[in-house]
């Protein structure tokens, strides 16, 4: 979009093709009458401060690597919202902000035991990313897990397991990378005997 026409409301827009440097090609300009212009703008987490503190980042999310309390690889440093990973809804941003705040308050009180983290692993051919990347057994918390599928899948069963114990299982009629999905569990620390794995398979 190179121009927007209208005074009190949108009446039309001018659109152009772009060259390899993303510059408009004026000879391709055309006018499209319309009454609204809707912009869908991608986001990338900004983590310059986290990097300065030595926080480990996940190449898949561009955000911090965290456990279920949202604590990063640096003790006492927590990450949430779109700085952690891009959320679809502001509701999820608010919820993770509340969670990070509560976790930080507990940490400041000195109630947090020494970390006993186990990794969360997933099939990278099917999942774009999974957050959190670790579960801290010492925290004895439930877990809210966010994920995006790598592409579109239909009639899938997603399982979070530790060894042979299925901690969470949820069925999805449709999965697409444009929609973030959420999995939740109560306290599972006593059931974790090994690393946590997240898998996806055709629904039976």
Name each region found by the language model.
Residues 1-48, 141-174:
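A Rossmann-like FAD-binding core segment of flavoenzymes
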Residues 65-67, 77, 96-99, 106:
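Helical hairpin unit composed of two closely spaced alpha helices linked by a short loop
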Residues 175-184:
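Aromatic sugar-binding surface patches on proteins
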Residues 1-2, 91, 99-171:
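Mid-to-C-terminal Rossmann-like scaffold of FAD/NAD(P)H-dependent oxidoreductases
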Residues 145, 158-160, 183-204:
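Short, aromatic- and glycine-rich surface loops/edge beta-strands on solvent-exposed regions
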Residues 35-87:
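FAD-site-proximal beta/loop scaffold in flavoenzymes
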Residues 30, 41, 57-59, 96, ...:
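Conserved mixed alpha/beta catalytic, RNA-binding, or beta-rich assembly cores of soluble enzyme
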Residues 1-9, 76-79, 83-89, 95:
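Predominantly flavin-linked oxidoreductase catalytic cores and closely associated redox partners
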């Amino acid at each position: 979009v190179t121009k927007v026409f209208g005074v009190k409301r949108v009446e039309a827009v001018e659109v152009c093709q772009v060259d390899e440097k993303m510059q408009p090609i004026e000879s391709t300009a055309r006018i499209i009458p319309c009454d609204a212009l809707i912009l869908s703008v991608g986001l990338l987490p900004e983590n310059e401060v986290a990097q300065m503190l030595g926080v480990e980042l996940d190449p898949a999310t561009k955000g911090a690597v965290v456990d279920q309390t949202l604590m990063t690889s640096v003790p006492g440093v927590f990450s949430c919202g779109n700085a952690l990973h891009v959320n679809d809804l502001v509701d999820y941003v608010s919820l993770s902000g509340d969670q990070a705040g509560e976790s930080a308050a507990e940490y400041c009180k000195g109630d947090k035991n020494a970390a006993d983290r186990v990794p969360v692993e997933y099939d990278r051919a099917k999942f774009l990313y999974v957050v959190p990347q670790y579960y801290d057994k010492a925290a004895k918390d439930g877990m809210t897990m966010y994920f995006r599928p790598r592409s579109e899948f239909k009639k899938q069963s997603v399982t979070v397991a530790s060894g042979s114990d299925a901690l969470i299982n949820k069925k999805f009629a449709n999965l697409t990378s444009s929609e973030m999905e959420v999995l939740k569990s109560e306290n599972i620390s006593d059931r974790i005997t090994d690393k946590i794995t997240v898998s996806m398979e055709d629904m039976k």
